[in-house]
Amino acid sequence: MNNRQLNVRLFGGTFVFNDTENSGDFFSFALDRPTDYLFDYNYYGRSEDSGLFSQQLILAEGGFKSQLEPAFANKWIATANASTTIWKYIMAYGDAGFVKNHGTNAEFVYDSGLRFILVEDYFEIFFPVYSNLGWEIAQPNYDQKIRFIVTLDFK
């Protein structure tokens, strides 16, 4: 297969000083969906917690596709994201990493699934298959676990 791809992305971050753990995770590292307090990303449902726009994915910080707990790290985070071509615009993806919060041990998190690229970097759909939560594809409300990338800001 001539058009096989392997994409690898690494992210690591630590806080030298962070005393905001009592006031929430607004400035913490995100595992799957950054808070975007500087409005750098094109979130269409910026403050949505449920519904279609809450499933929008921005590949930043942890870069995970599944919504796992802990969702944020207020001490440090280290993640790896990878995907490889299965056939044409269908890819398998996998993410793994460690999330550390104050007062708890570092937690290992992982997810995997299928990525359908309709228009690369502009319209992609992610179907989670297996993660820390088990077989996501067999769990209730699977349609709410599907993530997507939509970018209307052309480069």
What annotation goes with each model-predicted range?
Residues 6-10, 90-94, 114, 123-125, ...:
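Transmembrane beta-strands of outer-membrane beta-barrel proteins
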Residues 75-79, 109-113, 145-147:
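Transmembrane beta-barrel architecture of outer-membrane proteins
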Residues 1-85:
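C-terminal outer-membrane beta-barrel translocator/porin domains of Gram-negative envelope proteins
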Residues 12-18, 94-102, 120-122, 127-134, ...:
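Transmembrane beta-strands of outer-membrane beta-barrel pores
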Residues 114-123, 142-155:
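Outer-membrane beta-barrel "beta-signal"
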Residues 24-31, 107-109, 142-145:
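Flexible, surface-exposed loop regions and adjacent strand-edge segments
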Residues 1-4, 84-88, 117-122, 154:
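Outer-membrane beta-barrel strand-turn architecture
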